[in-house]
């Protein structure tokens, strides 16, 4: 199997829960593991899930337009991380902000953690049956791991990508930025849809 998934979802009144495990490359990894509390147009999510940064990263695997997210997206965004996020949504607006560690449940590190503060805003000035204008802006401020003093990768950000296929998961592109104090990234989204 390239990627075998098994998971469970549960809901009770205003609460939701999701746990999903993945098996790929002879390794088992926890994918999603979170609880959500929703009230009216707001929700709070805590656990391990995608940071609200790139639309290509946070959409479901079933909704991907190609076999894999673009290589640039894989290199410049993070996978799932442990954290907490607040979301507010209406028909025309979506706002999400969160605080995340640099750990995921499948790769717990014995180190001083970096952290990230994320935010995403979406505005849909036109949102009808056959017409849509979607404008989005997202930002992340991240600090690197304060790893143990004897580690060579202290205060380093790594950008890497396996390319456009998960069949061969070897890293094709990698760049390390060392002696980093923090990083700040901005992402934009624009979608215009019109159907006669």
Question: Which residue ranges define each predicted feature?
Answer:
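Outer membrane beta-barrel
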Residues: 1-105, 109-144
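Surface-exposed beta-loop-beta
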Residues: 113-196
């Amino acid at each position: 199997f390239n990627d075998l998934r098994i998971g469970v979802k549960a809901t009770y009144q205003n609460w939701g829960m999701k746990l999903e495990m993945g098996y790929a490359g002879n390794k088992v990894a926890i994918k999603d593991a979170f609880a959500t509390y929703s009230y009216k147009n707001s929700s709070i999510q805590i656990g391990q899930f995608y940071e609200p940064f790139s639309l290509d990263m946070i959409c479901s695997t079933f909704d991907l337009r190609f076999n894999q997210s673009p290589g640039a997206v894989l290199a410049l965004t993070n996978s799932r991380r442990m954290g907490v996020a607040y979301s507010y949504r209406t028909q025309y607006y979506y706002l999400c902000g969160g605080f995340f560690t640099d750990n995921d449940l499948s790769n717990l590190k014995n180190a001083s953690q970096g952290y990230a503060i994320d935010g995403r805003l979406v505005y849909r000035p036109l949102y009808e049956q056959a017409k849509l204008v979607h404008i989005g802006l997202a930002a992340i401020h991240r600090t690197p791991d304060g790893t143990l003093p004897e580690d060579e990768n202290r205060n380093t950000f790594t950008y890497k990508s396996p390319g456009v296929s998960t069949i061969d998961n070897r890293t094709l592109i990698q760049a390390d930025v060392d002696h980093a104090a923090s990083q700040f990234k901005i992402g934009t989204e624009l979608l215009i849809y019109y159907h006669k």
